[in-house]
Each structure stands twice: as C-alpha cells, then as structure tokens.
C-alpha cells in the first residue's frame, strides 16, 4: 500500500516485510500525547508568524484535540501501514479537517518531530521517577526512625564485620537514592532544550520562531545546532544511565531481602502481599517481588547497553537505526517505575526480626574492632599493635568456641596484662553501636537525627 505521506517518489508501496520491519506504531503510539502537544505548539507558532492563515490554524488545533480525545477514549485506530505515531495522527487529522491538515508539517520534519516527542516523554517520565524515588526514600527514612536502635550485623565480604543498626542500613539506601535523584535531575536539565524547528537536519527557510515553540512546550531554550538536534540521543542515554545506576541500587537491596528472608538468615519477614507460594512445596514463601526487582535491573542495564551500541556507529544526522531508541527506553524507564513501586511497598511491609538480628550481630567476633579501639584509648597502645593483640584474643576465643565477651579476664590478660574488666563494657553489641557517634556513624541517636532530617527534607507524601 502506498504511504500517502511520502509516496510521491515511489511507483508502488513497500514490500510486506519492509512494511513490517519499518513500522514503529506498535510501540511509539505511547508518544501520542507528546506528539499532539508538539503539533499544537508548532501550529500555533506557524499562525503567529503569519506562515499559516488563522482559519487553518483553528481547524488544525480543533482537529488535533479531537484526535487526542479519540485516543483517550480508546477509539483511535492505529494502522501499521502508516508506520508511526506522527503519520497516524496526521492521517486522522486529514480525515477530520481535510486538506488544511497538510499544512501542519510546514517547516517541520519527522526527524525534529520525533526528537521533540522523545524529549517530552523522557522528561515527563523522569519527573514521575523522581517522585517515586522520593517516596521510596521516605519509606526507608520512616523505617529508620522505627529501627534506629535495632542492632544487626554489618557485613563486608558477606561476613559479619561490625554491629550496625537496621535504621542505619536503611539510611544508606536513602543516600544512594538521593544521588539517583540528582542524576535524574541533571539529565532532565540537559535534555530540556527543544529540537522542534531543526527540520530534517539543516533548519528551514520559513521565518519560524523556535524560541516560542520551546517556551510553549516548557523547554528552557531551543537546541543550538540543527544537525545535533536531530542526531542526538544523549538525553535517552543519560537517562538510561541514571536509571541503570538506580536499578543497581534497588537490585542490591533486593538481593539483601532475598537473603534476609531465607530460613538460614531469618532477619526480616515479608507479608503475603510480596511473596508467593510453590506449586509443589506447601511450606514455601518465596520473595518473588524482590527477585523480580533484581532481575529487572539487568533488563534496564541491557537497554542502556543496547542503545549505546545502536548509536556508536551512526554518522550525522538521522538514520533509521535511531528508531530503535524507543522500545528499550520505554521499557527500561517503565520497568524502573515498577521496581520503585514494588520496593516502596516492600520497605513499608518489612518486619525486622529483632532478636535474630541481635544474635547475628554478636556472632563472628563483630566487636573485635571495639576491643582494639579500647586498647588504643585505655592503654595508649598504637593501633597496629592493638590490632595484633585483638587478633590473638579472637584466636583464643575461637579455639574455645566462645564469643569475645565470654572469654575470661584471665584469658585476655594472658595475652595482654594491661586489660582490665572495664573492657567488657565495650564488647556488647548495643554498646558497640552506641559508641559510633562520629558524623555518619551508626549510633542510634545519629540515625534518629539523620532520619528526621531526611523526612523534613522530603516533606509529606504528595497526594
């Protein structure tokens, strides 16, 4: 079937397989709202510049709003032979308003049109993601307040290292997510330039006002170079990069939840709302939500890698390869949205098992550093010497199969005669975490202050 939008040069329509590989309407239909917003701004500018007569502008504006309403009601028919959302909208507009619709594309190409649509969609999505990340931060900070004093093991190499609190652990993710929000906002600031009016690649001879269309669409300014305007997909790459880093953070937390909910750890419980059962093993409660967040992180990272590979060999300006920017970008950013919603729900649903956490915090000689610090403070011992002495004390306790706090004073003094019974005050896990009062440390009062500061900064949930 001949394509009415560009078929004049061709004696026949495309081969069926060409039509299939060429069409993007199956996925770029989600740009409909942005496409119509861009067209409304464009036609208003054409009218104000005297390029189109007022009656055509009015007809086109009314027709575009009718198309938008049809799409919203689910009545719009998306046809593959029209290739993409731009042609689909223009074709229906022509049916509604007649030949005047053909004037809409004056001083515009699909190259600058799709670049504008994509920037609008990514910008809208980044704004929504920022709000979701803030909600997850809020959930974590609220949990940190409740569990500022709940002792748990801190790990390095997935081995017990030093006691921390559950609240402190939650606040670590609040900080990571704050950086994610910064990256989303940086990406948004850089993408907020409008390519509309760059036309195919060289600009246009019509007296358009690109500053007017940029302002109408909420952009800070028009893009400065017409070639770059249509060739650039940095805005998608940067957004996918920020999304990938955020997904890595979510995946790390999801991995911890998978481990922590296992019978072997038993650190936290998730409700039925975020777990599933087994078709054969009736006892199972599987942390599927966390596992899916972990898996979707790979999908998001894959979208970034895929688009980098698409773009790496493209000469200026536009190539059809760039049509492949959409599916990965759409899927990745919407997958991240789903992951953020799931994680916020799981965090609010989490039930830490305090006794199990405390017991685990005391295992693995996690207060050994506290002993070394005590030797430095009380015996004025150089830290390297204190480290060596503490290692010998740990070895002595390990040989007896007991904890540090269970080793007798005589046993310790056999290694270092200067040790007194005052040392036992620092070997308990509560005393250990309480002593970590340095800025950013795990002391419960620190955690409460930082969590409160975050909640004040984040503000109430937006309705």
Curated annotation (Swiss-Prot):
Keywords: Amino-acid biosynthesis, Arginine biosynthesis, Cytoplasm, Lyase. GO terms for molecular function: argininosuccinate lyase activity. It catalyses: 2-(N(omega)-L-arginino)succinate = fumarate + L-arginine. Gene3D superfamilies: Fumarase/aspartase (C-terminal domain), Fumarase/aspartase (Central domain), Fumarase/aspartase (N-terminal domain). Its EC number is 4.3.2.1. Its main location: cytoplasm. It is found in: Cytoplasm. One of its GO terms (biological process) is L-arginine biosynthetic process. The keyword Ubl conjugation does not apply. The keyword Transferase does not apply. One of its GO terms (cellular component) is cytosol. It holds the Pfam family Lyase_1. Pathway: Amino-acid biosynthesis; L-arginine biosynthesis; L-arginine from L-ornithine and carbamoyl phosphate: step 3/3. Belongs to the lyase 1 family. Argininosuccinate lyase subfamily. This is Argininosuccinate lyase. It comes from Methylorubrum extorquens (strain PA1). The lineage of its organism: Bacteria, Pseudomonadati, Pseudomonadota, Alphaproteobacteria, Hyphomicrobiales.
